[in-house]
Amino acid sequence: MTIVNLAAYHFVSIDATEQWRPLVTARCNELGLRGTILLAPEGINLFIAGPREATDAFIDYIRHDPLFEGKFATLQFKESLSDSQPFRRMLVRLKREIITMKKPAIKPELGRAPSVDARTLKAWLDRGHDDAGRPVVMLDTRNAFEVDVGTFDGALDYRIDKFSEFPEVIDANRADLEGRTVVSFCTGGIRCEKAAIHMKEIGIDNVYQLEGGILKYFEEVGGAHYHGDCFVFDYRTALNPQLQPTENVTCFACRAVVTPEAQQSPSYVPGKSCPACAQAASAA
């Protein structure tokens, strides 16, 4: 059976997250969906999967059910396909933020930073500059272990371990960004949206967010100017530029990404250990 994988987020003020949670959970279970939906006062962030009929019904529900008062009427979804269900269960969780930055003054619903679509970005990267002739720098806002799976050619990577570290590393490295057009990017768009707003607020000019993130870029233009795959937070581990699951796996013990090459190591025991585990043990 072909499984449809949906990802979406939307920044919008929500006051009724506690009331919505059991109702959304019940509807997802009724449809046979699995995945995670995060609800917070600042909006929604979701990754769910199921048969086409179920995902289509969910899209109609979240956009049109009177419960949501039209808050998600324009919610846009990114879609990929897999041969099996990548999630084990269905969770609807309440959070303070749908992506944790610890900058409560940043409210994307009050105004986004400018965005650049995939085709325009590819044209900029093909030329080596934007439409105004400024050099373009790609800024990866993801965690270091995600970047190691794949990223844009020449992207800035400050090796952060969690997104809440982003404001501090930008403050320390803003000279890297001056005089250039900065395009922040992430997996699906949510982190780079907050990142771009923060950079605009601290006075960095010519900042854009990649509309829809890496996955939308893959969907629109493939893997141009990108090397490797894109890490995803489910049992597929990574998707290639054709949005197909790769042979990368996640170590059950330490959660490291294990490449096909690393899977040949004697240290790799499925469900128990990987080369990263062995290296950490030897260094202890």
Swiss-Prot record:
Source species, domain of life: Bacteria
What does the record give as EC number? 1.14.-.-
What the entry lists under SMART domains is as follows:
RHOD
Instruction: Choose any GO biological process term that the UniProt entry carries and state it.
Output: tRNA modification
Q: Which reaction does it catalyse?
A: uridine(34) in tRNA + AH2 + O2 = 5-hydroxyuridine(34) in tRNA + A + H2O
Which Gene3D superfamilies does the record associate with it?
Answer: 3.30.70.100, Rhodanese-like domain
Question: Which ranges carry the Rhodanese domain?
Answer: 132-226
- The catalytic residues are 186 (cysteine persulfide intermediate)
Q: Name one GO molecular function term.
A: oxidoreductase activity, acting on paired donors, with incorporation or reduction of molecular oxygen
**Mind listing the UniProt keywords for this protein, alphabetically?**
Oxidoreductase, tRNA processing
What the record says about family reads:
Belongs to the TrhO family.
Q: What does this protein do?
A: Catalyzes oxygen-dependent 5-hydroxyuridine (ho5U) modification at position 34 in tRNAs.
Question: Which protein is depicted?
Answer: tRNA uridine(34) hydroxylase
Q: State the organism named in the record.
A: Burkholderia ambifaria (strain MC40-6)
Query: Which gene specifies this protein's sequence?
Result: trhO
